[in-house]
Amino acid sequence: MGKHLVKNGFTSDYTRWIYHGESDRGREEVLRQRIDEFDDDAGVGDMLNDYHEAHFEEARREEEPEATAKAYYEMLSAAQQPLHGHTKVSQLDAIARLMAVKSQFSLSRDAFDIKLTVFGSLLPVGHILPKSMYEAQKLLRALKMPYEHIHACPKGCILFRKEYAEAKYCVKCESSRFLEVDCGDDQKKQLAIPMKVLRYLPFIPRIQRLFMTEESMKQMTWHKNGRRYNPEKLVHPSDAEAWKSFDAIYPARALEARNVRVALATDGFNPYGMAAAPYTYWPIFVIPLNLPPGVLFQRHNIFLSLIIPEHLGNNMSVYMEPLIDDLLHAWEEGVWTYDRSTKTNFKMHVWYQYSLHDLPAYGIFSGWCVHGKFPYPVCKESLKFIWLSKGGKYSSFDKHRQFLPPDHPFRRDIKNFTKDVVVTAPAPPMMIGAAVRAQLDALEVNNEEGGFLGYGEQHAWTQKSCLWKLPYFDDLLVPHNIDVMHTEKNITEAIFGTIMDIPDKTKDNVKARVDQATLCNRPQLNMVPPRAGKSWRKPKADFVLTRAQRKEVLEWFQMLMFPDGYAANLKRGVNLATMQINRLKSHDYHIWLERLLPVMVRGYVPEHVW
């Protein structure tokens, strides 16, 4: 009875909140599922059946698979024989399960060899289980994906490939390609240890694998053949104007539903943790956009393509050379790919659709600095931010009103925005495509300081992105996108810090009060002059909580009960000593903004603020 109640609860019609982290299975089922993950041969069996249908049924076969796919299928066929005479488990199934266990539990090579030896001694005579990891890897060789280690200049000037493949020193800065040791008498010797290595995993073979089974092949044409239950809603990138615009410009490419559009995503991270010395890796991921919405952003459909061993900066174009070369080849010449569903080979074309990242990476990818006087990369210098004299920085305050409809009441509001200012100007024009390329081509290089002449005064270009090498880049309406979760986290963090009046995190500081007194008509927020030897006083704003109210809010957070995995950090991170919540992540801020903010401040702030 106890197990039944734990599993099913007291109410028979209780709705389980599985999308909020609540489990819908008992622990026994979860454990059994983990075990079954290493005992499921359905996927391998389906691939073998697909191969036999394609290779032996002459009535259905139209073409032989192309070379890579053929080697892949032949490996599967050779590995289909049973492990021994008394089982249906194939050699490939057994190796795949054992390799999965090795990966999950981080077994060493020696430990894996011993495990194979022990298992082999328990099997009947004549079994074909490999005796070592070397033999297992040899059998699985056709399953492996290619990867490259490319030596790079320590300063990021060049990659030692193509015409520089044999060079030992950088042709631009003369830095050594390899580690040097002092041999005395001012002599140095190069060791066979590269100073910097770029790791590249070609993405095209990984995309080709998606066409080798019928199920994934159908998913790769969903963008064109998939059913939309509500055509008025945007449920997929193919429903957007940018996708349709590209189809209209290149109808021949768009006609073939199997052609693939990809997105690039990147972000920097410290592999050694936040407490370690500052060091940044920049992985670049490739995402096929043809897939249905439900599987588009699943982990196995996001391909790691580049691992850049430093902050991107202005060297992004150098490190992305291999990726751009593959994109150029896939666009201009195409790649022969085997289609499992039609048993034919077709020439697959792949092209870049857009990138996805946070705002700083947006500036790196686009080549336009997102800080300073012209931080808006779409309108560029047409939208000039204002300078805050006390804050010592540029601000976008009140620049949003020009984007509103001409009859919007906010345009005529002279009280709640910049005082005594009515906005009649239209929205600045968006610069895209050929106009941006023409502006880039007209820039003059600053030979003395580097960069381009006029930077910071006339424009904010820091570099010409390597993406402009793509012949179709001019025709992309939205070549770059900002990650919503990053943006939401930054905005929510600022709101939370301001409401809770957290030092160094609140936007309602003394400098902001002085600047708003100059710009706005809000006398209740102006700094109060000193009296009788006292210092300047900052009046409390209606949207800021008192210390007692902040304590009540944090104690309320500690009492909140959430489903497992939903927002546990909000409770665990409360620190009453500092009146803060620590270790919050993007998802936690999302929950706070969407669910908790209205409840948290109601009753503490005036009705017009709430």
Question: Across the structure, where does each feature detected by a protein language model lie?
Answer:
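A structural signal for the principal folded core domain
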Residues: 1-610
